[in-house]
Swiss-Prot record:
SMART domains linked: AAA (SM00382)
Protein name: GTPase Der
Biological processes annotated in GO: ribosome biogenesis
Domain EngA-type G: 4-174, 183-358
UniProt: GTP 2 binding residues: 189-196, 236-240, 301-304
Disulphide-bonded residues: none
A molecular function GO annotation: GTP binding
Keywords: GTP-binding, Nucleotide-binding, Repeat, Ribosome biogenesis
Amino acid sequence: MTKPIVAIVGRPNVGKSTFFNRLIGERRAIVEDLPGTTRDRLYGDTFWNGREFTVVDTAGVLFGGEDPNLPEAEIARRTRAQAEHAIAEADAIIFIVDGRDGLTAADSDVADVLRTTSKPVVLAVNKCDSQERMLDAVEFYALNLGEPIPMSAFHGLGTGDVLDRLTEYLPPKTFTQEEERHLRIAIVGRPNVGKSSLLNRLLGQERSVVSSIPGTTRDPIDTTITYHGEPITLIDTAGIRRAGKIERGIEKYSVLRTLRAIERCDVALLLIDATEGVTAQDTHIAGMVVEAKKGLILVVNKWDAIEKDSHTYYAFQDQVREAFKFVDYAPIVFVSALTGQRVSHLLDYAREVYVQRQKRVPTSELNNFLREVMLQQPPMAVKKGAHLRLYYAVQPQTEPPVFLFFANDGELVHWSYARYLENRLRERYGFQGTPIVIVFRSRERKEER
């Protein structure tokens, strides 16, 4: 099931980031951070009252953050753009205002935009850290967005009330027959890299279309095909009409749409335009895939449009590897969606990555492996002179593969030794195209790297 997307909107300095961090900080995954992603987290999964959802810092998504020193007119324009983007892309909206500042013209302007949507809007009055401030929240009834809920994101006061109201609008977690397990591939990338052309080429190559399920104006379009007798769902993020007028540039490319596709897939095909080379946006999207712990294949498209000599392929491959060194496990495939060159290989690569994600190493074999690699390279501790021992290992889950190593003190394990173990695991067992997660647990408590 696709998690609902909840967008946080509001003026600068009203406490959006504090509220966002409080929500995300309440729930830690097995491994919170992975190497290779240095950007700020603009989104994350959380849950409340049995409802799981993805919360998004809309200002960060649209503008890479916010600058309160901008001219007032520019701040107003950006804040309004947040609201328009949220209306177009999110399933629900949390509109945060500042109880200390009181009602401002910019708040009213955003409210005018939000009242045009039928999507649920929760009005949260932040910085109400006293009884007097909470009473002042009634001023925001004037926005005609329902009952204003006082809260203090910094202290955590009232945040539960905001989430209680929000989850009234979110559907309970259910599963349908269409969600039976099979390979799901998301086609992602910047605008105009050939996502739709690739999808059309994949659909046109000796495969029968089982079903074509159109999404809403917010959802990617799913097309299920059969390939070698197995169903494969292709999730396309291109060519989807958007409701409402969005800021230029955002019209063509939606982070939320890409997030939704990545969250639902097993393997992402990240398209790179060979005529333009690797861009920062390409690596940013790869970072999304890493953070979601999904399989990844780097697809260099428009290879037919490049003038080549005997060194071109290797030089471009080196360029891609250098730019994406934080996903050095991802295969690189050079294709042309226009001519069909090597496109037929992509589904085979994706099927293999899917198999690698499901691979499980028996515990006895894993511990033989651990003894062997420790003989080659004893465990390294972060503290000089500290005594570190690794006792045994298990693989508690797949998709992605997670390896749990028990130590006398998990805090002592140096990050480079985690990398060493990952490299040795990949050398021995493959895991091509999928992240693997290394977790260290002390005998007394769990510690993660």
